[in-house]
């Protein structure tokens, strides 16, 4: 335990904070091209076919990104925008594709949480 005088002289050393989305290089989003679109299964207690894409970013880094929502129109060579945010039950998936921008269409027939899935407001009848 240091004395007050030692703390005044030296101070505490701050630990370096590690980025959770290093491929974005401190940018909020990055554009990229899908190199492969496929499904994979999640970790142990869960069971599903999660839709993911391998994306080559404009800075040359290739990452794995999750495609949120029900149904998508992405295929190889689709241009997408990605953001940070991992998927807890998919190891190695640290990014999300933003729906409703570039080639990624919004989720069809979605009424709640539309802004997160790039869906326009439905027309009133």
UniProtKB/Swiss-Prot annotation:
Annotated PANTHER family: 30S RIBOSOMAL PROTEIN S12 FAMILY MEMBER
One CC-aspect GO term: small ribosomal subunit
Pfam families, sorted: Ribosom_S12_S23
Keywords: Methylation, Ribonucleoprotein, Ribosomal protein, RNA-binding, rRNA-binding, tRNA-binding
Region Disordered: start-end pairs: 1-27, 103-125
Protein's name according to its UniProt entry: Small ribosomal subunit protein uS12
Intrachain S-S bonds: none
């Amino acid at each position: 335990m240091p004395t007050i005088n030692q703390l005044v002289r030296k101070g505490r050393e701050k630990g370096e904070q590690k980025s959770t989305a290093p491929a974005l290089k401190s940018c909020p989003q990055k554009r990229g091209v899908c190199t492969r679109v496929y499904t994979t299964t999640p970790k142990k207690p869960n069971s599903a076919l999660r839709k993911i894409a391998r994306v080559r970013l404009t800075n040359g880094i290739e990452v794995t990104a999750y495609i949120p929502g029900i149904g998508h129109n992405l295929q190889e060579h689709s241009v997408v925008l990605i953001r940070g945010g991992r998927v807890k039950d998919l190891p190695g998936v640290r990014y999300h594709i933003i729906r409703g921008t570039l080639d990624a269409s919004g989720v069809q027939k979605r009424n709640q949480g539309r802004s997160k899935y790039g869906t326009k407001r439905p027309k009133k009848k």
